[in-house]
């Protein structure tokens, strides 16, 4: 849905483009929002500001038009709120995964060593990857990286939590600390963004991938390129080519 005008956030309904409504998950976020809060929705530039908070809906003003779709991330720009690190849906998913003998888990939006401690206690015999994608994770980086073995930098969400021009610095900082602490860091998001609609990468993308490997990343993650892109196979093939060149000249 192309959003150009005012919208309402509703507590209990899903996207209703005909009545300018959408909802957010988890539902408890609704109660934390207040007047003048600034929200960045997804990665298509949509920005909205809370105008008025009612008991079951929030009226918002669109400050920058953009695309609204299902399952998009929402970032509160102007302040921080404290939510449970696992939702009811997360806990149910973990229960199902354990019953089906799943041994690998990733914790999104890891904010502190306390989050890692709780997750380790919940899943003592599984491999766990902790995602670094918030400003609080950057603030608590040393204590977080002292508590785990495997981490993943999500550059997309981190760029919304901080600013995009800081991402190269944060990436290098995390990878440098990882070498020192002898832990693994994987890097994700926007490696081959141009290949969403083009069979060939740009020189800038090639350099980004190679530099990330040189700096010590233990793995690279393709997301939208293979999930919804038009050239998923070509993306994987190109990534393998660069990794081969890196290993050859390492």
What residue ranges belong to the model's regions?
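Non-catalytic helical/linker scaffolds that mediate oligomerization, partner binding
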Residues: 1-250
